[in-house]
Amino acid sequence: MARFIFITGGVVSSLGKGLASAALGALLQARGYSVRLRKLDPYLNVDPGTMSPFEHGEVFVTDDGAETDLDLGHYERFTGVPARKTDSISSGRIYTNVLEKERRGDYLGKTIQVIPHVTNEIKDFISIGEDEVDFMLCEIGGTVGDIEGLPFFEAIRQFSQDKPRGQCIFMHLTLLPYIKASGELKTKPTQHSVKELRSIGLAPDILVCRSEGPIPVKEREKLALFCNVRADSVIAAQDLKSIYEAPLAYHREGLDQAVLDAFGIAPAPRPTLDTWEDVADRIYNPEGEVKVAIVGKYTQLEDAYKSIAEALTHGGMANRVKVRIEWVDAELFDKEDATPYLQGFHAILVPGGFGERGTEGKIKAAQYAREHKVPYLGICLGMQMAVIEAARNVAGIEEAGSEEFDHEAGKKRFEPVVYHLKEWVQGNHKVSRSADDDKGGTMRLGAYDAALTEGSKVAEVYGSNAIEERHRHRYEVDIKYREQLEACGLKFTGMSPDGRLPEIVEWTDHPWFIGVQFHPELKSKPFDPHPLFKDFVRAAKDTSRLV
């Protein structure tokens, strides 16, 4: 049966609970334990699938089709354990489940209340698969004191009481602000945060304190005294140049040992950290640098493309180069020449997105990459924009566009080279959708197989003619234009197993120009870079030697 580690946060949000959880998971794995990480979000959305990228950042998609918080991406990248639908829950989903049960009569006419019905639903979620792993790490979103988080804090309090003594511990992440005028780290915000936590029945076993530098012994002892934790369980989380140094940094601070001590596990297996030492070496000792432009519409918030940025970093590690990402707003050249904005880059990446805004700029980015022989990777919408560019400027379909944009305009303006996908095959059954369906959870989501053309660039990159990748889209390139586009040199080199849905396109007369309908960034890891990103950065490295 699993031991449970509950990770909470205080003082301010966005301190890095997800990264701390992921790094701890990696350290426990390095000692030979199996782990699973979960995220419990107090917001009332059922999932983040319909939330604005500016509001929430990236939506991370799992193999089984869940739309989840970007922290699950950190969990996967650090541990290599594929996340599942049962690893992410929100207040919205919890309340939906409770109300559905009430409507079915499952509660036998009782009055439905936060305690016990909502808290029981949360506890049931936490318990899923507890016999499968050695450690279950559960991160509670938000900060202590948030009203919407109270049912979750009460649920984990009850959960820890339901389990045998010593089976649950609590790790609290806080901020130690540094006051330059006095040259001091201030512990009072952390003390008050722990006081708030204790007032709702939770006592932290471990304090992880974010700070700009080391925590002096005096401050550690003060925190230990007033927060009622052991001094060696006060862990410094200093600012790092790379998130992938976090496992090594936390190990140096003794986080993994503090966790094992809290559970009374002794003697504990020694960790094997060779993988993370190699990752750190590749990050901090590159042999060159490449410049990659990400041409998108959410570039003001880099978290909107979190997995893409990390996958490029992984590709850089594999090629021993630093990838310098520059964020380019596609709207800047919607109506003008893209050359001044894109010249000098060693590669161009156009990511996914929704809506018409910025799409003309993305089409011009694809055109620039094609005409100037710059390596190009188009992901999801980025592939669709590359196809539309080819249709307009090479195949002679001047009005080529997407049905998505006609839908927004309310009238037909384009020839729909990209159309609204209403039917597809998932496993052994057909999935049907209509324009009247809810927006949430109705896209083509999760892992799907694709068959690659033998001898194609992508087959060479993957080293296989069969792949499985994660998807998140409701629009698709129309197969009826395949012959016309292939006659111009844009080959459809990846298809769904039934041959109906284009998955990959590539220009045969270009050094490296690939568009994919799926999201390869979601499966990339620092110790196992995705083949597409690995080869994309290699192509950028080759280009950098020519300019």
UniProtKB/Swiss-Prot annotation:
Q: Does the keyword S-adenosyl-L-methionine apply?
A: no
Q: Which residues bind UTP?
A: S13, K186, T187, K188, P189, T190, Q191, K222
> Annotated region Amidoligase domain: where?
1-265
**Belongs to which family?**
Belongs to the CTP synthase family.
Q: According to the UniProt entry, how is activity regulated? A: Allosterically activated by GTP, when glutamine is the substrate; GTP has no effect on the reaction when ammonia is the substrate. The allosteric effector GTP functions by stabilizing the protein conformation that binds the tetrahedral intermediate(s) formed during glutamine hydrolysis. Inhibited by the product CTP, via allosteric rather than competitive inhibition.
Write the protein's name: CTP synthase
The UniProt annotation places L-glutamine binding at G353, L381, G382, M383, Q384, E404, R474
The keyword Cytoplasm is assigned to this record: no
User: Its Enzyme Commission number?
Assistant: 6.3.4.2
Q: Which domain of life is it from?
A: Bacteria
Role played: Catalyzes the ATP-dependent amination of UTP to CTP with either L-glutamine or ammonia as the source of nitrogen. Regulates intracellular CTP levels through interactions with the four ribonucleotide triphosphates.
**Transmembrane intervals:** none
Could you give the subunit structure recorded for this chain? Homotetramer.
**Known InterPro entries for this protein?**
Class_I_gatase-like, CTP_synthase, CTP_synthase_N, GATASE, GATase1_CTP_Synthase, P-loop_NTPase
Domain spans labelled Glutamine amidotransferase type-1? 291-546
NCBIfam families named among the record's database cross-references: PRK05380.1, PyrG
| Annotated CTP binding sites | S13, D146, I147, E148, K186, T187, K188, P189, T190, Q191, K222
Metabolic or biological pathway: Pyrimidine metabolism; CTP biosynthesis via de novo pathway; CTP from UDP: step 2/2
Keyword annotations: ATP-binding, Glutamine amidotransferase, Ligase, Magnesium, Metal-binding, Nucleotide-binding, Pyrimidine biosynthesis
PROSITE patterns on file = GATASE_TYPE_1
Gene3D superfamilies attached to this UniProt entry: 3.40.50.880, P-loop containing nucleotide triphosphate hydrolases (3.40.50.300)
| Source organism of the structure | Ruegeria sp. (strain TM1040) (Silicibacter sp.)
Q: Which GO terms describe its biological process?
A: 'de novo' CTP biosynthetic process; pyrimidine nucleobase biosynthetic process
Q: Which residues form the active site?
A: C380 (nucleophile), H519, E521
